[in-house]
Regions:
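Glycine-rich phosphate/adenosyl-contacting loop at the front of the ribokinase-like
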Residues: 1-46
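Ribokinase/PfkB-type carbohydrate-kinase core domain
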Residues: 1-3, 23-26, 50, 61-76, ...
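A glycine-rich beta-to-alpha transition motif near the start of alpha/beta enzyme domains, typified by
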Residues: 7, 15, 19, 45-71
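Conserved beta-strand residues within beta-sheet cores
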Residues: 44, 81-83
Length: 223
């Protein structure tokens, strides 16, 4: 599966088709899921984002607070971003994403104070849709001495933004996360060869292998 960006109208059309399947509503997104997981381990976490002043926005805000995540959220008159996730029995998923208010977060919203008190900065590759925003955030985090982490998000995101992603990683990123498809899209290679090539740009590289675990390169060490 992959991720496709859609508008409000298309999102409503898809929801009309799938609502008979009794879908559930949960907070999600690559960064949100990661931060939630860390918060559940008792780690001090925060999240920066833009939400709408609507039911979805309130749900997301309260869910983050309930999980122990400190929200650094800006608000918009637009609808809160949402994603319809279609999951097959083999766990492959297709994501129909309407960015909504999320895409209105800009580089002007990012300041040094947002990073105070944190040691790591994690950003999802989907944010390359706003090149100025992702580069500004990574640059400031890097300059303030945080360890910066980037998840490549989806193979089609990698294919469409390959040169820009390589530049970002080379200049600002310490840790790269990718699954097998994303690593191959990034390098044209597989497994250890892909791991080593990405490792030329970042200090730590993690390639996720689903039920088989992960392979990790840290300096010269591979596990």
């Amino acid at each position: 599966g992959s991720m496709q960006l859609i508008n409000d109208e298309r999102s409503a059309e898809i929801y009309d088709v799938v609502k008979s399947l009794s879908p559930s509503m949960v907070s999600g997104g690559s960064a949100s899921n990661t931060i939630n997981g860390l918060a559940n381990l008792g780690i001090n976490t925060g999240m920066v984002g833009m939400i709408g002043e609507n039911e979805l926005g309130n749900f997301f805000l309260q869910d983050m607070k309930n999980s122990g995540v400190e929200p650094h959220f800006f608000t918009s008159q637009s609808r809160t971003g949402s994603c319809i996730s279609l999951i097959r029995p083999d766990s492959e998923r297709t994501l129909a994403t309407c960015l909504g208010a999320a895409i209105e977060l800009t580089a002007d919203n990012i300041n040094e104070e947002l990073f105070d008190g944190y040691d790591y900065f994690y950003v999802e590759g989907y944010l390359v849709q706003n090149a100025e925003l992702i580069e500004t955030a990574l640059r400031i985090a890097h300059e303030k001495g945080l360890k910066t982490c980037l998840d490549l998000a989806s193979y089609n995101v990698v294919e469409d933004n390959l040169d820009f992603l390589k530049t970002l990683i080379r200049k600002y990123v310490d840790v790269v996360f990718a699954n097998e498809e994303e690593a191959t899209a990034f390098t044209g290679k597989e497994d250890i060869e892909a791991l080593n090539e990405i490792g030329e740009l970042a200090d730590i590289v993690i390639i996720k292998l689903g039920c088989k675990g992960s392979i990790v390169k840290w300096g010269e060490s591979i596990t």
